[in-house]
Amino acid sequence: MQTSDLLRHQLIKSLTTQRPEKGTDAAVDLWTQMAAQLILIIGAGGFDSLYARSVFLSQSTHPWLAARSGPPQTDHRFADLKKSLQAQSPTLARDANCLLLITFTNILASMIGEHLTSRILGSAWDIDTQDTADKEINSA
């Protein structure tokens, strides 16, 4: 299956284009919701490692994406991301956030599987992904 055909990617693209009036706040909300779910499972250190790797990989396309300037603080975990996105045009910021989310979830899915990744994202973003995950498995 082509990577661009993954329903998870389509979901991320859809979510990153919603609420354009909220701008970077909407982008950070997606990350905050996902982090809350994943940290319960893999811990803050595990999440931070995956996030740092995703930023590093995404910097080849968007070199202005900032890596964390220090140890993450729970209440400001995505402050550097927000600053990076705010410094760009809304379209470029949206595209970069979409790539970063896709990169992050690709890494996660390679570790825990597509089905579990979809379930976690569905829980984080309050979306029923059961049908989505079943379609992914059946078409693989």
Describe each PLM feature range.
Residues 1-140:
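Long, compositionally biased intrinsically disordered regulatory segments in eukaryotic proteins
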